[in-house]
């Protein structure tokens, strides 16, 4: 959202959900001029508890939007753009189910148009019309490497042998996957690879919970990323000190979701580790399903690359399992000597 606002030089056409619903939602009397709203990452809508905490309205964002639509004079269209498996924050765990729950308490009949696979999720709608044209299943992010999302899904499911098979397919399509324990090797590689390419974008990504990466140059602590200038980070030219290409500032899953880089350097943190047969995490995070939220965070991070990605794994014995798992999944080892 901030990247679009920065690029368009406008805060009117693209707004954040929280601000929009503070103005027009709940029991407010103000009415928007628009009858069509596009909700990017609609599966990440806040539930009633989170909405109460954020803006004092004990009503979920889906219900708030639909009730607002019913208050309009004649008609309303809610377009939801959905990225499955990308619920990454507290209050988002219910996913698309919240939209069906909201439909179930509406006063007016709502018609849902969706891909066939999602049709069973909207049993509370007055009518469900499925159309496969709404299933946007061809990625524009990975330059025709269409198996990238499948590789990431298999990795997070712990199916390393299937990842190995898919990695050969991806590399054949020109998508590069590297793993390194030398952060300087990663920095050297992206700078050399994209030397002179003024439209190229590469940068540092890390999980918001990976505090151990601070000592390796990943500035992913909360206060830093909260004040980060996300628009310039993605859009400024490489020579700008605010650009991602400066390799100074780090974007987390919250800043980079829905956007992409040519070659991200992804720091793997202590918030998700390999057990030998799958992935695990701490249960101290204040969410309903901490493991799924962490898996989804890494799903976002690992699917940002257009040309590929580099995963940096700290050179500490604790992370040996992660490094070997990524190698077994088909990631090529990158060292400073190799660069």
Report each predicted region and the residues it spans.
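Conserved Walker A/P-loop ATP-binding site and its immediately adjacent core
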Residues: 1-6
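C-terminal accessory regions
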Residues: 77, 249-339
